[in-house]
Amino acid sequence: MSHFFAYLSRMRFVRRWGLMRNTYDENLQEHTLQVAMVAHALAVIRNRMFEGTVNPERAAALALFHDAEEVLTGDVVAPIKHFSHKIRRAHLEVAGVARQKLYAMLPAAIRKDFRPLLFEEKADQPEWQVVHAADKLCAYLKCVEEIRAGNEDFAKAAAVLKQQVESIRLPEVAYFLETFAPSFAMTLDELNQSEPRPRRPQLRSQ
């Protein structure tokens, strides 16, 4: 018997942004899905527009496990995680131990297939690059949505994360920020009003 997927299913109980007042709570499972979608998109954008060779499906798969250790450790808020180099190193060590524990839960017959999903390997470096960018992007987009809802508690985090995202030297990230990010600051009515209307098909005269 393996507890691996039973633990992963508990992502939905891991609350993010624990020290912040949220207009809506975001759990780890929701965040993970969004990161997977954005990582896939970044890979596609790089390939189609910037002559990249990233595997979009691989990036999405890696993203599904990018915070897997938090089902054991919980979400450690950024101010604590980055308080000092010593604490940052300790956090990385704890995360590594948690990932090893999850990995050990897998049946031996399939364990090697999951290892690259739980531990970064050089062969997947291009895919992990877009996953990490997507992770940062999604944190910024959460802040944008909170500010749109009138929650100024996220204003400072939004400013810091925007600066961090803009400093990522990946053209696909800049494209995503310009093309997709502005819509996250809009209400549903605004999205509906600005949505391009489908063109009516031209009927041929008999």
Regions found by a protein language model. Give the residues of each.
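Alpha-helical, largely C-terminal catalytic domains
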Residues: 1-206
